[in-house]
Amino acid sequence: MNNFFEVKNVDFVAGGKTKVRNMSFAIENEGDVICLLGPSGIGKTTILRTIAGLQKIKNGSIELKGKTISSSDVNVEPEDRNISLAFQENSLFPHYTVEKNILLGLEKNKGKKEKQIDLKEILDLLDLSNILKQYPHQISAGEAQRTSLARTLLTQPDLLLLDEPLSNVDQSFKEEIQIRLKKILKNLKISTIIVTHDSYEAFYLGSKCGIIFDQELRQLSLIHI
């Protein structure tokens, strides 16, 4: 039986420099959440960008639902992968309101899934209902990050990639959002890869957690909390 998603012996490269060598890991079952833990600059974002198809690979392969999407001679275009990436930095359209930015996720998802996500539920869980009419320049970095997360969730991808998803969220509110995000991911059963430098976040959100150190994935273990 094939794994739902699998990386096989891939070197992840950015700017001509190898960030992570000969990396292999898998999401065995749809809906599992894997967290990759490591400090800034270790190559976590490069891993996500490569999985999303924004960077090519020269060795190994990446497979989703039994299909090769990246290898030395295969590179499925990003828009054809049904993978959604929420960047750490602000990726909102500045001239769209928060509401319109979020609804772009629904437009991308239109007709893709039989069961649609409850928009109100996502807005409530991420505490966005009171800022829908504001523009990106009028909201905080944490609110912008949660807006981007809502938009990405609404695309209902086969694979969700989250780059430091709560790094800009105010510390006084962060734990509550972690609880809500875990609930969302469990309810939606979206397979997810989260990269973070926050060990608590990694162990709380992930069903498995891997540690990246010295250009290698040192460990990928099942988490019991």
What are these regions (language model features)?
Residues 154-158:
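A short, proline-enriched helix->beta-strand linker immediately N-terminal to the Walker B motif
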Residues 96-105:
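Short coil-to-helix segment of the ABC ATPase nucleotide-binding domain corresponding to the Q-loop/switch region
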Residues 135-139, 143-145:
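Conserved ABC ATPase signature
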Residues 67, 113-131, 183-186:
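Conserved ABC ATPase "signature" region
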Residues 160-164:
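Catalytic Walker B motif of ABC-type/P-loop ATPase nucleotide-binding domains
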Residues 69-85, 108:
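ABC ATPase NBD coupling module
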